[in-house]
């Protein structure tokens, strides 16, 4: 009963504060702020559902050849974001925006700027990797 009451109170707040309407405007702003990323030579797709946006990086845009997972290109974007004070979510070579509902249009613009910079950095050079770079329990048999 207590959890249900809390859920109903949350729904009341969403209705009173017009959270869904505000999110529609913010998601539209997010789409506009990130639209230029679709033109990046290493971005296959920018996709969005509501307040969740994903940017998929690839080696070759025409063939949509993915980066090897071992290169962890998304992690490079994430690390750049942290250095700039932004939290982006990497999953392989896909970088996600998962902002809180209280984000402002200016903060969305900042996320788009940081993501663009991070993608430039992550896709600039070839990456040399070893399995031991990614798994702490990896033991070199040699």
Name each model feature, range by range.
Residues 1-142:
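Conserved N-terminal phosphate-binding loop of PLP-dependent enzymes in the Aspartate aminotransferase
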